[in-house]
Amino acid sequence: MRSLPSAVTVAIIGAGPVGLMSANLLGQLGIDVLLIERNAAPYDIPRAITLDDEGARTLQAVGLDREYLPLTLPSRGSRYYDDAGKLFAEVGPGPTEFGFPRRTQIFQP
């Protein structure tokens, strides 16, 4: 294990999507960042199912939109059921505004 620096401007705990993106954005601004993750490798089980238009714009800000967005599918909406099988929420696909679909689905085999 590498030794940790004695001082950094920003420490981020957790290398999930938010931690990774935050470290990326701060690094592009020239800010020294320490990203700490307890797991040695990413989870191999799919967990995220959608990306919204704000997430797409964030990917665009770091130059990843053209690489990532072709891997998504336009959302047709979602229905959410409780453990008894009762529908408790329904979300439509939403309009495409500001250059990106409101929601896209992430294909995870």
Where are these regions (language model features)?
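Short alpha-helical segment within the catalytic ATP-binding CA
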Residues: 20-21, 53
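A short alpha-helix capping/helix-coil boundary motif
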Residues: 2-3, 33-37, 93-96
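Beta1/beta-strand and adjacent pyrophosphate-binding region of the FAD-binding site
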Residues: 2-18
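Short, cationic motifs built from Arg/Lys/His that form the positively charged side of catalytic pockets
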Residues: 19, 38, 108-109
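Active-site-adjacent segment of FAD-dependent monooxygenases/related oxidoreductases
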Residues: 47, 51-109
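Glycine-rich FAD pyrophosphate-binding loop
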Residues: 13, 24-47
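A generic fold-level signal
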Residues: 5, 43, 72-73
